[in-house]
Every structure is written in C-alpha cells, then in structure tokens.
A protein has these predicted regions:
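Conserved structural motif at the start of ABC-family nucleotide-binding domains
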Residues: 3, 18-20
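The feature captures the beta-strand-to-loop junction immediately N-terminal to the Walker
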Residues: 34-36
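Helix-to-loop junction immediately C-terminal to a conserved catalytic motif
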Residues: 49
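Conserved ABC ATPase signature
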Residues: 114, 138-142, 146
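Conserved ABC ATPase "signature" region
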Residues: 116-134, 159
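Hydrophobic anchor residue at the start of the ABC signature
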Residues: 152, 180
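Catalytic Walker B motif of ABC-type/P-loop ATPase nucleotide-binding domains
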Residues: 163-167
Length: 181
C-alpha cells in the first residue's frame, strides 16, 4: 500500500475535518472519492501532501509509501497533485510553457537554465494534451478549463508514482474531459 491510515483525525482552524479515517490504497488502485461538500475529500489530499497533519492517538497510524515519517522532497517527487491550492500558488505572469516546465523542478515560478531535453519534454506533453497553442499564453489570461488542463500537464510531466486530481474535470470542455478520464 502506498497510503495507510488507521483511526486518523485531523483538525483545521479548530474544526475536525477528518474523523476516524481508516483507508488503505494499493499502488495498483484507481480511487475516486465521492461525497458532499465539506466531507473531507480535499482535506485528505492535504494530509497526503503533508499540508495538514493528523492528530496521532494510541491506536492511530499514518503511512505514506510505507513510512510514518517521509521527507517532503521525496513526497513531492513521487506525488503530483492538481487542486485549487496549486492553482493559487502559480505565478499569474508565468507562460504555460514555463508553468509546465516548473513541474519538473517542483516549483511554482519561472525556471532559469532549462535544458533542451526538458524543453522537449514540455513540447511533447503539450502536443499530447493538445495545448501547444497555449505555450506563450500567460496563466492569468487562461480560461478556467485551460488552467486546469495546463496544471494537469504540469503534474504529468514528471511521471509521478501517484497522481491526485481534485475535481479533475470541472471547467473542462468535452474533449479535455475525455482525455483526462
């Protein structure tokens, strides 16, 4: 299992956002979390990404990639996430090409000294996702759907072990929804 939670409770701003979570996710599984607003789906993503930490009690356990404590850099290399938190961290003056390139380096800003190999990877994924026409557009000028598909390309470029998408097809046109699914 790459993710194991036993009796996990999490609090955010003084409110319990996850109560007694018990969940195991195998490497080979595709998981879809469905639930009403406020049920803890996005909070679980924050736990996985180590943006919020659970309250560990006697019977509680949390392991990610088989480790109770994991180096954040290792985590960032192995997991790619697309959610509103990521969208809000992106420099709005970044062009889409540079946005996708930043995914290779785990950054949210312009990357200097990019290699030809890395540029080729960006061009390849943009072509595959049919967004080459967005290459020189600034992130702030994109539609919500264009932002989403560009962020998915950014997440995929480093070929992560785990891809986490929060509301992955929201704001996407039919063709893009089909590609993501």
């Amino acid at each position: 299992f790459w993710f194991e939670a036993k009796n996990i409770n999490c609090f955010k701003n003084g409110f319990r956002v996850i109560k007694d979570l018990n969940l195991k996710i195998a490497y080979s599984e595709n998981v879809i979390l469905i639930g009403p607003n406020g049920s803890g789906k996005s909070s679980l993503i924050e736990v996985i990404n180590r943006n919020i930490y659970p309250v560990i009690a006697n019977e509680s356990k949390l392991k990610i990639f088989g480790k109770e404590l994991i180096n954040l850099w290792e985590l960032r290399k192995r997991i790619s996430t697309v959610n509103n938190d990521i969208k809000n961290r992106i420099n709005p003056n970044l062009q889409v090409f540079d946005l996708i390139l930043s995914g290779l380096y785990g950054r949210y800003c312009y990357v200097q000294n990019k290699s030809e190999r890395d540029s080729y990877k960006v061009e390849k994924i943009m072509k595959k996702m049919n967004i080459s026409n967005l290459s020189k557009k600034y992130f702030s000028y994109l539609s919500d759907g264009e932002k989403k598909i560009s962020l998915i390309a950014r997440a995929l470029i480093k070929k992560p072990d785990i891809l986490i998408l929060d509301e992955p097809i929201a704001n996407l046109d039919y063709k893009s929804k089909f590609f993501v699914v």
